[in-house]
Amino acid sequence: MFCAEIMISKYQEDVKQPRACELCLNKHAVWYCASDDAFLCHVCDESVHSANHVATKHERVCLRTNEISNDVRGGTTLTSVWHSGFRRKARTPRSRYEKKPQQKIDDERRREDPRVPEIGGEVMFFIPEANDDDMTSLVPEFEGFTEMGFFLSNHNGTEETTKQFNFEEEADTMEDLYYNGEEEDKTDGAEACPGQYLMSCKKDYDNVITVSEKTEEIEDCYENNARHRLNYENVIAAWDKQESPRDVKNNTSSFQLVPPGIEEKRVRSEREARVWRYRDKRKNRLFEKKIRYEVRKVNADKRPRMKGRFVRRSLAIDS
């Protein structure tokens, strides 16, 4: 406390101008805190030293008593800022902007009339009531678009509403186009080659074949084919004298794809291969077994075994 008073006296002697608050830098310093080593104004001193219980115990020295309020001079206790509320504004801006009225109207319109229908919604399709006869050409319509209507711009730039299609009239017009197309093809062909199907009078008639001559040629062809027919009775008689080339025992298919004798050779080769594999395996197994027993006999003298097939020779000789 004595050191603080000495520093204040030196400060008052050396510096004539009042010192600014080190926290807000706007007002003159009224208090000096030795614990914080800071010069504070009256407002900053209240905010700093009422923060917690430890800060209230800091010893402070008043620099100019004439700037202190009457409450402080009278010895009234300072209430904590934490109980009365913050006096300073928050450092970070708390912007609470409400939505504009136009934006709210747009949101309400979107909710009432959605452009994209929700999947599974009841308002997705609008089916008008009609008789059973009219249900054949019924197409689901979206409710929002039926109210608004379809607008298409033509080549002049103006907007015109499209008419509802009548499918029966459209089908009739398509049929008319189809038949008119055939008639146009016929007329175009007739105009392109007007004399195609007509015979010129200047031509010779020697090259023309009459119908009677054609029929005579066809009959001659039938007679020639009849001459080349097979005599089935003679073929059957010659077939009975000879044996059938097919072998019923070795016939593996109805078409005799595999010649006789090949299947027997295949079975024989498979059996020989199995026998060869068995003998090779048996020989290897016996050889391995013989080696194993020989190794046990050699190691019988090194390992003392009282039971078993192989006993040490020294024990056998002693007994």
From Swiss-Prot:
Keywords: Metal-binding, Nucleus, Zinc, Zinc-finger. A zinc finger (B box-type) spans 21-63. Residues 271-313 form the CCT domain. Residues 90-115 are annotated as: Disordered. It comes from Arabidopsis thaliana (Mouse-ear cress). This is Zinc finger protein CONSTANS-LIKE 8. It comes from the Eukaryota. GO terms for molecular function: zinc ion binding. PANTHER family: CCT MOTIF FAMILY PROTEIN, EXPRESSED, ZINC FINGER PROTEIN CONSTANS-LIKE 8. PROSITE patterns: CCT, ZF_BBOX. Residues 95-115 have a biased composition (Basic and acidic residues). Belongs to the CONSTANS family. Pfam families: CCT, zf-B_box. Zn(2+) binds at C21, C24, C44, H49. It is found in: Nucleus. GO terms for cellular component: nucleus.
